[in-house]
Swiss-Prot record:
The gene is ecm33. The GPI-like anchor contains a phosphoceramide lipid group. The anchor position has not been determined. It comes from the Eukaryota. GO terms for cellular component: fungal-type cell wall; plasma membrane; side of membrane. It holds the Pfam family LRR_5. It comes from Aspergillus fumigatus (strain ATCC MYA-4609 / CBS 101355 / FGSC A1100 / Af293). Belongs to the SPS2 family. The keyword Glycoprotein applies. This is Protein ecm33. Involved in conidial and mycelial cell wall biogenesis. The keyword DNA damage does not apply.
């Protein structure tokens, strides 16, 4: 009995010390050396935020740790070459790396769940050692890295997915991704980037800039914008897409085919402009556009046989010799309710705001391209939709 009298309090005290050594909620733990990291090797779970000191040099490994109940971050660690955590399976908050300019290895073979990913300025990081793959994350932002692919990012759902300025990035295939609750954005990556989202069925906003291929065969509906600027793919197909917000195809130099056979509703503006190789626009199921229809270019055919309601402006101009008869009738029958213009065989086709509708137009409409792009303002938003106007302005700035 006497032994128990003293042993039990001692054991409790030892447990308290061990718990304290594994961090506390809202505490920041600074790791300045491998010995600092080894001090937590007896911890299955570390509580609080782990910050890797920017002055640390070489490799750092977190052995035996399975869970971080906070953030794992490093900012400005210019001499850190490797970060590893062989057994870590979850980071509850943010996995943040910024300015690790010599980092070549990121080894987290057991990691499957992250609160969010924020990686910026990791130019020497060419691949990920994420064997199991991260299948759960809130927002993912990856900017200015040397990654050639995103193998190891195997998300089922995501909030924002923002992939920009990764100039070595050749391919992205997020096979398991089914839903996105925030913006999906690709911009400024390698011009030959191919994006495959084979099982994505729903989302909010999706924007693609300077990509060579986009595959979204399962996409069914978007609540926000779907936009393409300056891409180099020849064909875009969304066979199951029925509804989206603003829809934009702007300055895609090689685009010859747009296939959206199931599209019925555009909740916003619908802009097709400056796609000089596009000769035909066929939208067999389109019924409703709540914003403006604004098509300009070099196309010879335009077909929207089921069109029932265009609430905004209708501008259709092309160098091609198509017929306006169907759309004249739709305007007279009040199917098209806004300001109406349809012009075939127009040498200098323009958008509804006067910007050039082709990349080779000359004369007044060509010079109008810059001035009118610069004049986009809130007065234009109700007809075309905010996101489409914003996208057009961004493309002009770029």
């Amino acid at each position: 009995m006497a032994f128990l009298k003293y042993a039990l309090p001692a054991l409790a005290a030892a447990q308290a010390v061990l718990a304290a050594n594994c961090g506390k909620t809202d505490e920041t733990i600074t790791i300045s050396s491998q010995s600092d990291a080894d001090g937590y090797s007896s911890c299955s779970t570390i509580k609080g935020t782990i910050e890797i000191d920017e002055h640390l040099s070489g490799a750092i490994t977190f052995n035996n740790v399975k869970q971080i109940d906070g953030t794992l971050s490093c900012t400005g660690g210019a001499n850190i070459s490797s970060i590893a955590a062989p057994m870590l399976n979850s980071i509850a908050d943010t996995f943040k790396l910024d300015g690790l300019t010599t980092l070549t290895t990121l080894s987290f073979p057991s990691l499957t769940s992250v609160g969010s990913i924020q990686w910026t300025a990791l130019p020497q990081l060419q691949s990920l050692d994420f064997t199991k793959g991260v299948n759960e994350a809130g927002d993912v932002t990856i900017t200015n890295t040397g990654l050639a692919n995103l193998n190891g990012i195997s998300l089922n759902t995501v909030g924002k997915f923002d992939i920009t300025e990764n100039t070595q990035l050749k391919s992205i295939n997020i096979n398991n991704l089914k839903n996105a609750t925030g913006l999906i954005n690709f911009a400024g990556n390698l011009n030959s980037l191919e994006v495959e989202l084979p099982n994505l069925s729903s989302g909010t906003n999706m924007t693609f800039r300077n990509v060579s291929a986009v595959s979204v065969p399962s996409l069914h509906n978007l609540t926000g914008q779907l936009g393409f600027w300056g891409d180099t793919f020849k064909s875009f197909s969304a066979p199951n897409l029925t509804e989206t917000g603003d829809l934009v195809f702007n300055s895609n130099s090689k685009l010859t085919n747009i296939s959206m056979p199931a599209l019925e509703t555009v909740n916003g503006g619908f802009l097709i402009t400056r796609n000089d190789e596009l000769s035909s626009i066929d939208l067999p199921s389109l019924k409703v556009v709540t914003g403006a229809v604004d098509f300009s270019g070099k196309f010879d055919e335009v077909s929207m046989p089921k069109l029932e309601n265009v609430k905004g402006q209708f501008n259709l101009q092309s160098t091609g010799n198509f017929s306006c008869d169907t759309f004249d009738k739709a305007h007279n029958d009040k199917v098209i309710r806004g300001t109406y213009k349809c012009k075939a065989a127009e040498p200098n086709p323009t958008t509804k705001d006067g910007s050039s509708g082709t990349t080779t137009s000359s004369g007044s409409s060509a010079s109008a391209s810059k001035s009118n792009a610069a004049d986009l303002n809130a007065a234009n938003l109700p007809a075309l939709g905010f996101a489409a106007v914003f996208g057009a302005l961004v493309q002009y700035v770029l």
